[in-house]
Amino acid sequence: MQRLKLDEARYEVVKGGFGTLAAAGHAPLSLDLATRLGDRFSAYREEQMFVFPGAHDAIDEFKARGVKLALVTNGAAGPQRAKVERFALAHRFDHIQIEGEHGFGKPEERAYLHAMQTLGVTASETWMIGDNLEWEVVAPQRLGIYAIWIDVHGDGLPADSTVKPDRIIRSLTELLPPERG
């Protein structure tokens, strides 16, 4: 499963691009350069990662209200666990489920079923919130989960999308009840 070996996949993509250039008559480029480009892209991606604005506050408010919370994420165990720590998420969730630690991930049904079972909730009691239409909307909806798509950049659904999220938000704070004054 390539999403558990992203660095290797990036090297292969760069090497493939170099091969295409060479086949088109361009001077061959070194594999060392492919490795360095792949490494730099990985570092760049890491630098660009962020917690959605308002996420910590919203998650903390849900937890304070007694909502059971699971973080379900794909990827290799080491890098994902490092992100959980980097973004101070561990204490905020009742269950953290990383694909590389469990051997399955989204959009596999058992990823959602395992999280629900661990929390002791049913599909009708569950909300799935995320920015990936396939993994956090389509697949959960098949199980009867209320699927919320977070459109953090405000781009809206792709024009050709047939996906219909149960709700679209720009920030997790939109899910909190309004403050009473």
Predicted regions and their residues:
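Short C-terminal alpha-helical element
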Residues: 35-39, 52, 130
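A metal-dependent, Asp-based hydrolase signature
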Residues: 1-40
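Conserved phosphate-coordination/catalytic loops
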Residues: 8, 49-53, 105-106
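Asp-based, Mg2+/Mn2+-dependent phosphohydrolase catalytic module
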Residues: 32, 56, 60-63, 67-181
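Surface-exposed cleft-lining segments at the edges of enzyme active sites
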Residues: 41-48
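Short helix-to-loop capping/linker segments positioned immediately adjacent to catalytic or ligand/cofactor-binding
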Residues: 25, 48-49
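Short alpha-helical segments used as structural interaction elements across diverse proteins
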Residues: 7, 42, 77-80
